[in-house]
Regions:
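Membrane-embedded alpha-helical segments and adjacent helix-loop junctions characteristic
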Residues: 42-129, 280-350
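Hydrophobic alpha-helical transmembrane segments
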Residues: 1-7, 39-42, 83, 115-132, ...
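Hydrophobic transmembrane alpha-helices of multi-pass small-molecule transporters
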Residues: 1-67, 74, 172-302, 400-423
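Membrane-core helix-loop-helix motifs of multi-pass transport proteins
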Residues: 120-217, 353, 380-415, 423
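Transmembrane alpha-helix interface/packing and boundary motifs in multi-pass membrane proteins
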Residues: 13-20, 96-105, 136-148, 321-335, ...
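Re-entrant/interfacial helical elements at transmembrane boundaries that shape
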Residues: 73-75, 108-119, 132-133, 145-162, ...
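Residues that define the loop-to-transmembrane-helix transition and helix capping
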Residues: 23, 51, 88, 129, ...
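Hydrophobic residues within alpha-helical transmembrane segments
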Residues: 6, 28-31, 50, 59, ...
Length: 423
């Protein structure tokens, strides 16, 4: 177990230090995990989340068709016409991303909203880095709001046998949706404060962008609808969402070819698929698979349980804040999967309702990824988009938004859940 922890920690230090080489560092570390036997060859495919990888590939290609149609430019014009200055343009985009992310996967949300943000920044001639970071962290926050917003929410809903409406009203009380929205309200104020110096007025638009093709927009909206519908299908294949995104990209490419009559025109959307972002995620999945196989996550869960002792409030507090810390560095899906049965056992031993512990786990694990640029797939995707546009995201750029945003969101949720379900 110790070698796995050392390799994992060293890899993260290198990725934070040499941000331009993150994909190569992560892939190299993943290969080392395999070669040393810490991740057996037979477990490699199981460690890779093909659903996320296919979603990113499919949505990236589809979004390129969306961009080429000029629809993001038109949406940018609409947003710019409604807000007074750059500050509120950034806040409104983050809030809009959050609303979408409550029903659609976080990564897909970032890929869909980022083109609109980039277009606004081009028109305003301002740096898009904080805009995209704001969109990414807002997407991560709202993933816990509904049953369909994030994989961890689906896992928790399954463990507690919760319906879609149970996320709004549970055990005769307002449920976790309102904890998330309370955090969203305060974190929006944090974003407004972070962007407080961006008071430049929005210039009056002298012309309105003309959309060249509405089919990519229909396909993108269709993607959202199908992803929502798929979330209600019981026992569906793990790669369902990824296949939906890739299938709609295929439809878009076929339509594009039928429209232009040139196969070469199909290359643009395919070239837009960011292989470096996908490579980074592959490396991270292999690393996480390695530490999971070596028992690191199980040991971390056991330590949390021991640290909580027999006091429900102490246990709740430890679970929330340790989940924030752990999820800042490792994918929250294997962590949550490990902690769900641990919490069930603890609740049985203590003879208490496990609801506050489960809700604390979900809120902490979901928001923890916002603390670091590589703590969540949505963050990695957003940074990848910026890199392709020629922008470098320093760790400090992310920390100054991600960390205060996380604490502004988690503190009210922490208090809310305990007051309603712990006392």
């Amino acid at each position: 177990m110790i070698p796995a922890i050392i390799l994992f920690v060293v890899t993260y230090i290198l990725m934070l230090t040499f941000s331009k080489y993150r994909p190569y560092i992560a892939l190299a570390s993943g290969v080392i995990f395999i070669l040393t036997g810490m991740l057996p060859l037979g477990n490699v495919l199981g460690a890779l989340d093909f659903n996320v990888l296919l979603m990113i590939a499919g949505t990236m290609g589809l979004v390129q068709l969306f961009i080429d149609s000029k629809m993001p430019a038109l949406l940018a014009d609409g947003i710019m016409a409604k807000v007074p200055n750059v500050q509120w343009a950034a806040v409104c985009l983050a809030l809009f991303a959050g609303v979408i992310s409550a029903f659609v996967d976080n990564v897909a949300t970032v890929l869909m909203i980022a083109p609109v943000a980039l277009e606004i920044c081009r028109k305003l001639k301002t740096n898009p880095v904080p805009f995209i970071i704001g969109i990414a962290v807002s997407s991560n926050l709202q993933g816990a709001a509904t049953l369909v917003g994030d994989t961890t929410a689906i896992m928790l809903g399954s463990a507690l046998d919760m319906s879609f409406m149970d996320f709004f009203w549970y055990q005769g009380k307002p449920s976790i949706f309102f904890a998330v929205e309370l955090g969203a309200l305060l974190s929006a104020l944090i974003l407004a404060f972070i962007f407080r110096k961006e008071k430049s007025p929005i210039p009056t638009q002298t012309s309105v962008t003309k959309v060249t093709d509405y089919v990519p927009t229909v396909l993108l909206v269709g993607t959202i609808v199908l992803l929502i519908c798929a979330s209600f299908i019981p026992n569906k294949p793990d790669v369902t969402n990824g296949l939906i995104c890739c299938a709609l990209l295929a439809v878009g490419l076929i339509y594009h070819f039928a429209k232009t009559g040139e196969i070469a025109e199909m290359a643009g959307p395919l070239k837009s698929i960011d292989l470096e972002t996908i490579g980074l995620l592959v490396g991270l999945f292999l690393m996480i698979g390695g530490v999971s196989n070596m028992g690191v996550i199980d040991a971390a869960a056991a330590m949390l349980a021991k640290a909580g002792g027999g006091n429900l409030f102490v246990l709740y507090t430890v679970i929330v804040w340790a989940s924030v810390l752990i999820s800042a560095f490792i994918d929250n899906i294997p962590y949550v999967a490990t902690m769900i049965p641990v919490i069930a056992g603890l609740a049985t031993q203590l003879g208490v309702d496990p609801t506050p512990l489960y809700f604390g786990l979900l809120s902490g694990a979901t928001l923890g990824g916002n603390c670091t640029p590589i703590g969540a797939s949505a963050n990695i995707t957003g940074i990848g988009i910026l890199r392709r546009e020629g922008y470098t995201v320093r760790n400090a750029d992310f920390f100054k938004i991600g960390i205060p945003f996380t604490f502004a969101a988690i503190v009210p949720a922490y208090i809310y859940i305990w007051l309603l379900y712990g006392i």
